[in-house]
Every structure is written in structure tokens, then in C-alpha cells.
Amino acid sequence: MKKLLSTLIACVALISVSTAQDPNFSQFFASPMTLNPALTGKFDGVYRFAANYRNQWPTISNAYTTMTASFDMAILKDRIPENDQFGIGFMGYSDKAGDGALNSTYFGASLSYHKSLDENGFHSIGAGFQGTYMNKRLNTSKLTFGDQLTPFGFTGVTQESFASSQVNLNYFDVNAGLIYTGTTNGYNNFYLGASMYHLNRPKESFNRGDYVLNMRTTIQGGAKIPVGSYNSFHFAANHSMQAKAKNTMVGGAFCLNVNNDEENPTNFYLGSWYRFQDALIPYMGLEFGEWHFGASYDVNTSSLKAASNSRGGVEISLIYIKKPVDPGAKKLNCPKF
């Protein structure tokens, strides 16, 4: 029991950090299924694949390395009204905290339905639901225990042993969201959504305690504003609340159509986002054919910049949207990220 003191302290620290570490991408707009379950299937195309990678605070023992991958598509198109969308999607998530001391993995599935509010499909409101199965695992080889520290230094050997239930944690989680999308002329676009996570308040404890996850609420919005015949401004904001923690991001990017082709554009994006009281995030993106690539870098502006050397972390996103086989198919009004 005496030797477990340092272990318990480490576990409590890891758990408290990890509960606040839901997927937290600076390019939130490039990770639709972690942003809002209602965005499942909400795109103009046949199917969509999205992948995200984030290495947060690399100078602090690789504090977090996060990866996600998702696939979603619209279904039953011949059985619902023309301007409605019924979406289904699947997602995987992996996060390593503390240089791999705590590993989190989940798999999820989502459903959404978007109801058109007018005959042109210019305005719609949608709802989505998501279920995930989470596994968290402690890698005790990455931890230091009391009996490894002696008057002669660090031994690297411990006599501590743990049952599987003490290093593995599993639970089911439920999320939901709503979103409104609209356009005034078929060229501009705007959206406003809200989502809630951990609706079932799952228990999360390695020592069979009664700690439950607090619900997390996010509010997001954005717009695409055409500039001239081919270019556009894109704005997006996201506000997240969980217990006493808050996270607010605002910013935008200018989209330059390099080839002056609206149907098959090659677009270059350049902009920046700001996470309040934390980081400035320059962003660069490239869209060509059915691919959209994004890269950003967090520059810490908070008190953490001394420990991180202002290096908040690099993030990369990749989205592939399969275009409809029929080039004359009606285009749907969807958020443009």
C-alpha cells in the first residue's frame, strides 16, 4: 500500500487530464464527426473520408498525440425527399497521453437526418446521434513507482503488480447534436450548430470509484462568403464547455481559386484561428479534385509558452469527398469547410 502512493498520484493526474482531453482539434472544421454528430453525411458527394493528426505540446514529454479517422455517407436517397439527407458514419480515435503512459481508443457510429425547410433546399435543420465504445489503458512501464527511487538513485525495477481491472477501463458513451444550414443564393453558406457529449455520464475510474464524466457542450458556427467570381472568405468559430473548463476558438481563411474554375477548382487557403488565452494558430490548406489537405501550428501565447517554448503543436487534416457520378446532379447546400 505504501508503494502505491506515487502510483495513485500519477493515475489521478492522468485521469483528470484525460477527461478534459476529448478530441480537441485546432482544425475543428476539418473533423466533422467529432465536432457535431449532426454533421454525419452532411456534404455534397457520395461518401467522405476524413483523417486528423495532432501532436500537442511536443516539448513536454509528448503530452498528447491524437489521431482520428472517419467515414460517412448519405443513404436512402431514393426513399426520402430530394432535398433531405439521411447520413450514417463510423469513426475511430486514438490518443496517447504522457508519452504513452495513458492510451485511449474508441470506435463510434453515427446517424443523422437533415430536413429541408424550403423547396429549393436552401435551408435545412438536422439532428444526429452518436454512440462510442471507449477503452483506456495505463502503460505502467511508463510510470515511476516509489520503490524505484532509493538513496542510491533510480533502480528502474519495481515490485508493483496490477490486476487487469486496475489498468484497463471500458465504457459506452452517447453524444447528440443539432445543426442549421442555410444560403441566400446558392453561393454563400452559413451554419450554426450545438452538440452535447457524454449524455449518459459514464463512470471513468481505474480504482472502481464513482467519478463520472461531465457532459461537454459545444456551440459552433461558420460562413462562406464569396469574393468576386471564384474566391471566398471562410469563417468558423467553436465554443466548448465542460464542468468549469471552457475553450473558445475563432478565425477564418481566405480561399484563392488558383485555376479560375468553379466546377473543378484548385483552391489555396490561408488564414489563422485564435484559441482564447492559449494560442495563435496559422492555417494553410489546399483543395484539388476530391481532396482537401490542411496544416496548422499552435503558437502558445499563454503562461504555458515558457515550458512549451511557444510550441503548442502541429496538426494535419485530410478529407476526401467522392463526387457524384452524374456531373449534372443537383448540388446540395452543405457547410463548406
Feature locations, PLM:
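Subset of outer-membrane beta-barrel
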Residues: 21-337
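Sec/Tat signal peptide C-region and signal peptidase I cleavage site
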Residues: 15-20
